[in-house]
Protein backbone atom coordinates (compact mmCIF):
# COMPACT_ATOMS: atom_id res chain seq x y z
CA UNK A 1 0.00 0.00 0.00
CA UNK A 2 1.30 3.43 -0.93
CA UNK A 3 1.93 6.31 1.49
CA UNK A 4 2.03 9.99 0.72
CA UNK A 5 5.55 11.21 0.04
CA UNK A 6 7.28 14.14 -1.61
CA UNK A 7 7.90 14.46 -5.31
CA UNK A 8 5.56 11.78 -6.62
CA UNK A 9 2.82 11.88 -9.24
CA UNK A 10 0.33 9.02 -9.12
CA UNK A 11 -2.99 8.16 -10.75
CA UNK A 12 -5.56 5.65 -9.47
CA UNK A 13 -3.37 4.36 -6.64
CA UNK A 14 -4.42 2.49 -3.50
CA UNK A 15 -3.18 4.09 -0.29
CA UNK A 16 -2.71 2.57 3.15
CA UNK A 17 -5.96 2.28 5.08
CA UNK A 18 -4.71 4.18 8.14
CA UNK A 19 -1.45 6.09 7.81
CA UNK A 20 0.01 8.40 10.47
CA UNK A 21 2.31 11.22 9.42
CA UNK A 22 4.07 12.99 12.28
CA UNK A 23 6.34 16.05 11.97
CA UNK A 24 6.71 15.38 8.24
CA UNK A 25 7.01 17.76 5.30
CA UNK A 26 5.39 16.51 2.11
CA UNK A 27 5.81 18.66 -1.00
CA UNK A 28 5.51 18.77 -4.79
CA UNK A 29 3.16 15.81 -5.06
CA UNK A 30 0.22 15.22 -7.42
CA UNK A 31 -2.46 12.63 -6.66
CA UNK A 32 -5.20 11.89 -9.21
CA UNK A 33 -8.25 9.59 -9.06
CA UNK A 34 -7.21 8.02 -5.77
CA UNK A 35 -8.70 7.17 -2.39
CA UNK A 36 -6.30 8.57 0.20
CA UNK A 37 -8.22 6.58 2.85
CA UNK A 38 -7.48 7.68 6.46
CA UNK A 39 -4.30 9.77 6.75
CA UNK A 40 -3.62 11.39 10.12
CA UNK A 41 -1.42 14.48 9.92
CA UNK A 42 0.19 15.40 13.23
CA UNK A 43 2.19 18.63 13.15
CA UNK A 44 2.88 18.21 9.42
CA UNK A 45 3.61 20.66 6.63
CA UNK A 46 1.98 20.02 3.26
CA UNK A 47 3.33 22.22 0.47
CA UNK A 48 2.34 22.42 -3.21
CA UNK A 49 0.27 19.23 -3.20
CA UNK A 50 -2.41 18.61 -5.82
CA UNK A 51 -5.41 16.37 -5.13
CA UNK A 52 -7.53 15.94 -8.27
CA UNK A 53 -10.67 13.77 -8.04
CA UNK A 54 -9.57 12.21 -4.77
CA UNK A 55 -11.36 10.85 -1.72
CA UNK A 56 -10.03 12.43 1.49
CA UNK A 57 -13.14 11.94 3.60
CA UNK A 58 -11.29 10.37 6.51
CA UNK A 59 -8.28 12.71 6.63
CA UNK A 60 -7.42 14.24 10.02
CA UNK A 61 -5.29 17.29 10.85
CA UNK A 62 -3.86 17.92 14.32
CA UNK A 63 -1.13 19.71 16.30
CA UNK A 64 -0.58 22.80 14.21
CA UNK A 65 -0.44 21.25 10.75
CA UNK A 66 0.11 23.75 7.92
CA UNK A 67 -1.17 23.35 4.38
CA UNK A 68 0.38 25.79 1.89
CA UNK A 69 -0.19 26.31 -1.84
CA UNK A 70 -2.20 23.10 -2.14
CA UNK A 71 -4.92 22.47 -4.71
CA UNK A 72 -8.03 20.38 -4.08
CA UNK A 73 -10.08 19.84 -7.24
CA UNK A 74 -13.27 17.76 -7.67
CA UNK A 75 -12.41 15.97 -4.44
CA UNK A 76 -14.48 14.54 -1.61
CA UNK A 77 -13.59 16.32 1.64
CA UNK A 78 -16.71 15.38 3.56
CA UNK A 79 -16.11 14.78 7.25
CA UNK A 80 -12.45 15.78 7.11
CA UNK A 81 -11.57 16.24 10.78
CA UNK A 82 -9.59 19.21 12.04
CA UNK A 83 -8.63 19.74 15.67
CA UNK A 84 -9.71 23.13 17.01
CA UNK A 85 -7.15 25.75 15.94
CA UNK A 86 -4.81 22.97 14.83
CA UNK A 87 -4.59 23.56 11.05
CA UNK A 88 -3.81 26.59 8.88
CA UNK A 89 -4.49 26.61 5.13
CA UNK A 90 -2.59 29.32 3.23
CA UNK A 91 -2.83 30.12 -0.50
CA UNK A 92 -4.86 26.97 -1.13
CA UNK A 93 -7.42 26.45 -3.90
CA UNK A 94 -10.61 24.45 -3.47
CA UNK A 95 -12.53 23.86 -6.70
CA UNK A 96 -15.77 21.87 -7.06
CA UNK A 97 -15.14 19.99 -3.81
CA UNK A 98 -17.70 18.46 -1.47
CA UNK A 99 -16.84 19.92 1.95
CA UNK A 100 -20.07 19.12 3.78
CA UNK A 101 -19.34 17.90 7.28
CA UNK A 102 -15.72 19.09 7.19
CA UNK A 103 -14.92 20.90 10.44
CA UNK A 104 -14.09 24.14 8.64
CA UNK A 105 -14.80 26.18 11.77
CA UNK A 106 -11.73 24.69 13.47
CA UNK A 107 -9.23 25.78 10.81
CA UNK A 108 -7.78 29.09 9.66
CA UNK A 109 -7.87 29.98 5.96
CA UNK A 110 -5.55 32.71 4.65
CA UNK A 111 -5.54 33.88 1.02
CA UNK A 112 -7.55 30.81 -0.06
CA UNK A 113 -10.10 30.48 -2.85
CA UNK A 114 -13.28 28.40 -2.82
CA UNK A 115 -14.96 27.94 -6.19
CA UNK A 116 -18.24 26.05 -6.59
CA UNK A 117 -17.70 24.02 -3.43
CA UNK A 118 -20.42 22.46 -1.30
CA UNK A 119 -20.20 23.19 2.41
CA UNK A 120 -23.82 23.76 3.34
CA UNK A 121 -24.94 24.53 6.87
CA UNK A 122 -21.56 25.45 8.35
CA UNK A 123 -20.49 28.18 10.77
CA UNK A 124 -17.35 29.99 9.64
CA UNK A 125 -15.54 32.20 12.13
CA UNK A 126 -14.73 35.60 10.63
CA UNK A 127 -11.42 35.70 12.51
CA UNK A 128 -10.36 32.52 10.69
CA UNK A 129 -11.27 33.75 7.19
CA UNK A 130 -8.50 36.12 6.08
CA UNK A 131 -8.54 37.59 2.59
CA UNK A 132 -10.33 34.60 1.06
CA UNK A 133 -12.36 34.50 -2.15
CA UNK A 134 -15.58 32.56 -2.65
CA UNK A 135 -17.42 31.88 -5.91
CA UNK A 136 -20.63 29.97 -6.62
CA UNK A 137 -23.67 29.35 -4.43
CA UNK A 138 -23.32 29.52 -0.64
CA UNK A 139 -26.19 27.78 1.14
CA UNK A 140 -27.09 28.12 4.84
CA UNK A 141 -23.63 29.39 5.78
CA UNK A 142 -23.14 31.54 8.87
CA UNK A 143 -20.23 33.96 9.09
CA UNK A 144 -19.78 34.68 12.78
CA UNK A 145 -17.66 37.23 14.62
CA UNK A 146 -17.11 38.55 18.11
CA UNK A 147 -19.07 41.76 17.58
CA UNK A 148 -16.48 43.88 15.78
CA UNK A 149 -14.52 41.21 13.92
CA UNK A 150 -13.92 42.14 10.29
CA UNK A 151 -14.85 39.60 7.65
CA UNK A 152 -12.12 40.03 5.04
CA UNK A 153 -13.53 38.13 2.10
CA UNK A 154 -14.48 38.53 -1.55
CA UNK A 155 -17.93 37.08 -2.27
CA UNK A 156 -18.50 39.16 -5.40
CA UNK A 157 -19.21 36.10 -7.54
CA UNK A 158 -21.50 34.36 -5.06
CA UNK A 159 -25.20 33.73 -4.68
CA UNK A 160 -26.18 33.80 -1.01
CA UNK A 161 -29.05 31.48 -0.10
CA UNK A 162 -29.81 31.45 3.60
CA UNK A 163 -26.43 33.01 4.43
CA UNK A 164 -26.27 34.84 7.76
CA UNK A 165 -23.80 37.33 9.19
CA UNK A 166 -23.59 37.50 12.98
CA UNK A 167 -21.37 39.84 14.97
CA UNK A 168 -19.01 40.70 12.14
CA UNK A 169 -18.00 43.90 10.38
CA UNK A 170 -18.61 43.69 6.62
CA UNK A 171 -16.80 46.91 5.69
CA UNK A 172 -13.87 44.90 4.26
CA UNK A 173 -16.09 42.35 2.53
CA UNK A 174 -16.72 42.64 -1.21
CA UNK A 175 -20.46 41.86 -1.61
CA UNK A 176 -22.08 39.90 -4.44
CA UNK A 177 -22.43 41.77 -7.72
CA UNK A 178 -25.17 39.47 -8.98
CA UNK A 179 -28.82 40.44 -9.24
CA UNK A 180 -31.04 40.48 -6.16
CA UNK A 181 -28.26 41.12 -3.64
CA UNK A 182 -28.36 44.28 -1.56
CA UNK A 183 -25.57 45.67 0.63
CA UNK A 184 -26.88 47.98 3.36
CA UNK A 185 -24.85 50.20 5.69
CA UNK A 186 -25.77 51.80 9.06
CA UNK A 187 -27.96 48.80 9.76
CA UNK A 188 -28.12 49.10 13.56
CA UNK A 189 -29.27 52.74 13.35
CA UNK A 190 -31.85 51.83 10.70
CA UNK A 191 -33.15 48.97 12.85
CA UNK A 192 -33.45 51.21 15.91
CA UNK A 193 -35.58 53.73 14.00
CA UNK A 194 -37.66 50.98 12.40
CA UNK A 195 -38.49 49.38 15.76
CA UNK A 196 -39.50 52.76 17.18
CA UNK A 197 -42.05 53.32 14.41
CA UNK A 198 -43.24 49.82 13.60
CA UNK A 199 -46.33 50.07 15.80
CA UNK A 200 -47.48 53.05 13.75
CA UNK A 201 -47.86 50.97 10.58
CA UNK A 202 -51.61 50.27 10.20
CA UNK A 203 -51.06 47.93 7.24
CA UNK A 204 -49.28 45.29 9.34
CA UNK A 205 -51.18 42.29 10.66
CA UNK A 206 -50.20 41.01 14.10
CA UNK A 207 -48.56 38.00 12.44
CA UNK A 208 -46.51 40.09 10.02
CA UNK A 209 -45.59 42.53 12.78
CA UNK A 210 -44.16 39.73 14.91
CA UNK A 211 -42.13 38.33 12.02
CA UNK A 212 -40.90 41.79 11.05
CA UNK A 213 -39.83 42.65 14.59
CA UNK A 214 -38.07 39.31 14.96
CA UNK A 215 -36.27 39.79 11.62
CA UNK A 216 -35.18 43.30 12.55
CA UNK A 217 -33.93 42.37 16.01
CA UNK A 218 -31.56 39.83 14.49
CA UNK A 219 -29.79 42.78 12.84
CA UNK A 220 -29.51 45.06 15.89
CA UNK A 221 -25.76 44.48 16.35
CA UNK A 222 -24.81 44.73 12.68
CA UNK A 223 -23.41 47.86 11.04
CA UNK A 224 -23.62 46.38 7.55
CA UNK A 225 -25.55 43.48 6.07
CA UNK A 226 -25.94 41.71 2.75
CA UNK A 227 -29.41 40.54 1.74
CA UNK A 228 -30.52 38.22 -1.05
CA UNK A 229 -33.90 39.80 -1.74
CA UNK A 230 -35.06 37.02 -4.05
CA UNK A 231 -34.34 34.39 -1.41
CA UNK A 232 -36.23 36.50 1.14
CA UNK A 233 -39.22 36.75 -1.20
CA UNK A 234 -39.29 32.97 -1.60
CA UNK A 235 -39.47 32.62 2.19
CA UNK A 236 -41.69 35.53 3.23
CA UNK A 237 -43.35 36.79 0.05
CA UNK A 238 -42.74 39.92 -2.01
CA UNK A 239 -45.11 42.16 -0.03
CA UNK A 240 -43.39 41.41 3.27
CA UNK A 241 -39.93 42.00 1.81
CA UNK A 242 -41.04 45.32 0.33
CA UNK A 243 -42.32 46.37 3.75
CA UNK A 244 -39.15 45.12 5.48
CA UNK A 245 -36.88 47.34 3.39
CA UNK A 246 -39.32 50.23 3.63
CA UNK A 247 -38.95 50.14 7.41
CA UNK A 248 -35.16 50.05 7.00
CA UNK A 249 -35.43 53.15 4.81
CA UNK A 250 -33.79 51.52 1.82
CA UNK A 251 -35.07 50.12 -1.45
CA UNK A 252 -34.54 46.55 -2.52
CA UNK A 253 -34.33 47.90 -6.08
CA UNK A 254 -31.19 49.99 -5.45
CA UNK A 255 -28.90 47.05 -6.32
Model-derived segments and spans:
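Long, ordered, amphipathic alpha-helical scaffolds
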Residues: 171-255
Amino acid sequence: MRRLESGISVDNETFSDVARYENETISRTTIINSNIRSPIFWSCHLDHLVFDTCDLTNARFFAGSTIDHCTFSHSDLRSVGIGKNEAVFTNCEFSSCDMRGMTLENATFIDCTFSNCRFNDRVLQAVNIVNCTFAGKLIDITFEGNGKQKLIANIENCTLDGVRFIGCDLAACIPPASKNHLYVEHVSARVKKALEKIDDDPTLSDHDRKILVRSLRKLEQMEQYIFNTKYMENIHGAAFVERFFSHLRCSKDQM
